[in-house]
Structures are given as C-alpha cells and as structure tokens.
Curated annotation (Swiss-Prot):
Disulfide bond residue pairs: none
Pathway participation: Amino-sugar metabolism; N-acetylneuraminate degradation; D-fructose 6-phosphate from N-acetylneuraminate: step 3/5
Family as reported in the entry's similarity comment: Belongs to the NanE family.
InterPro entries named in the record: Aldolase_TIM, NanE, RibuloseP-bd_barrel
Any one biological process term the GO annotation gives: N-acetylneuraminate catabolic process
Xref: NCBIfam families: PRK01130.1
Role: Converts N-acetylmannosamine-6-phosphate (ManNAc-6-P) to N-acetylglucosamine-6-phosphate (GlcNAc-6-P).
Organism: Escherichia coli O139:H28 (strain E24377A / ETEC)
Record's protein name: Putative N-acetylmannosamine-6-phosphate 2-epimerase
Keyword NADP: no
Length: 229
C-alpha cells in the first residue's frame, strides 16, 4: 500500500491531525532532542504525521517516531522572499534524513530554483511532495505540476497584513478542485481545525497552539491583561 493510501486510512480513522514541532528559534525548547520528544508525544496522542524543520531536528525525530514526517528547511535569502525548502540540496538532505513528505514553497514568487525542479527532485527520491501555497492559483498550478499535497500554509503571509483567522475559503476552493489539502496557518483552536475538515481539508496542521509555549503564554497574558484594564 502506498504512503498516500496509508495516510488516507489513518486520517479516516483518526481525524487528520498533523502536529508541527517547530519551537521558537533560540527558545530553550529549540533543541533536536526536545523537538523529537514533542513529536513522540504528539504521535502517542494521535497525530497522523509530524512536520519538522531542519535536518538535525528531523534526524532526531526520525529515530523515535513511526508516523510520516513532513520535512522542511527554512532559510532567509537575500534575493528571494521564499524561505521553505528553496534549494535542491535541501531536498536531498531531508530525503537522506528520513523525510516521507517534503514540503516546499509553492508560491508564484522569485526563487532560486523553480517549483517544478524541486518537485522532480522530491519524486526522484521516491517521496511525496507538498507545496505550501498562499492562493488558489498557487495551489492549482502546483497540482498540475504533480504535487500530491497542497498546503494553505502561506495564506496571509505573502501580503502586507496577516489576518487573525485561518483561510477556510482557500481550503474549500482547493478541495473542490480535487486537491488533497492540508489546512495550515492560524489553526489555533480545535473548533477551527474542525471547521477546516468541514470545508474539505484532507488534514490539518497545528503548530503554535501545541508546540510553541511562548506563543501560548502570550495569548493568555494578552487576554488576562485586557480583562483587568
């Protein structure tokens, strides 16, 4: 059975939660062994897959989890706004470190390596390709190029302002077009994740609300300060 078919079965049985284990950079939690521990806890709690940034983090996580890993490498480039898995060598390193799925930036923006070239390299390794997109046009273009999974990851992050709510309309549009959609980006409550599934999401990735302690504390502190002012 293919990995995609296995995931279809797991999602149907367990609800489709993917946990992104990406600590705040330079946080006390930003250590491969801690990332791996968070990933294992997420797997034991029912996550069907884990999203991991960085080769060292992925190597540590691969050693302890059995669920599929979505691997990415983030870089800050001087000549491109693209940050997620921008280079062939990133794909190769993630493949060697044990990724099952490799996610790349799938937006229509200047980049060092074309999307189709990165997708071909992922498939060369026999892995599934996911594209992190921001618009319906991005997602549909990537689907035509052969990406098996389309993420709404970058919706709201390629524009001057980022909305507070997740982009459910994008989930529905891509799902209606026949894409396997991973809803991602600002899914901070179980109710929002459930809404994404009702809008046609194949799965939902949750990051900050589960694995970024600093963000969660900030949400509580902000709300509590407002309550007493």
């Amino acid at each position: 059975m293919s990995l995609l078919a296995q995931l279809d079965q797991k999602i149907a049985a367990n609800g489709g939660l993917i946990v992104s284990c990406q600590p705040v950079p330079d946080s006390p939690l930003d250590k491969p062994e801690i990332v791996a521990a968070m990933a294992l806890a997420a797997e034991q709690a029912g996550a069907v897959a884990i999203r991991i940034e960085g080769v060292a983090n992925q190597q540590a996580t691969r050693a302890v989890v059995s669920v599929p890993i979505i691997g990415i490498v983030k870089r800050d480039l001087e000549d491109s706004p693209v940050r997620i898995t921008a280079y062939i060598e990133d794909v190769d390193a993630l493949a060697q470190a044990g990724a099952d799925i490799i996610a790349i930036d799938g937006t229509d923006r200047p980049r060092p390596v074309p999307v189709e070239t990165l997708l071909a390299r992922i498939h060369h390794h026999g892995l599934l390709a996911m594209t992190d997109c921001s618009t319906p046009e991005d997602g549909l273009a990537c689907q035509k190029l052969g990406a098996e999974i389309i993420g709404t990851t970058l919706s709201g992050y390629t524009t001057p302002e980022t909305p507070e709510e997740p982009d459910l309309a994008l989930v529905k549009t891509l799902s209606d077009a026949g894409c396997r959609v991973i809803a991602e980006g600002r899914y901070n409550t179980p109710a929002q994740a459930a809404d994404a599934m009702r809008h046609g999401a194949w799965a939902v990735t949750v990051g900050s609300a589960i694995t970024r302690l600093e963000h969660i504390c900030q949400w509580y502190n902000t709300a509590m300060k407002k309550a007493v002012l």
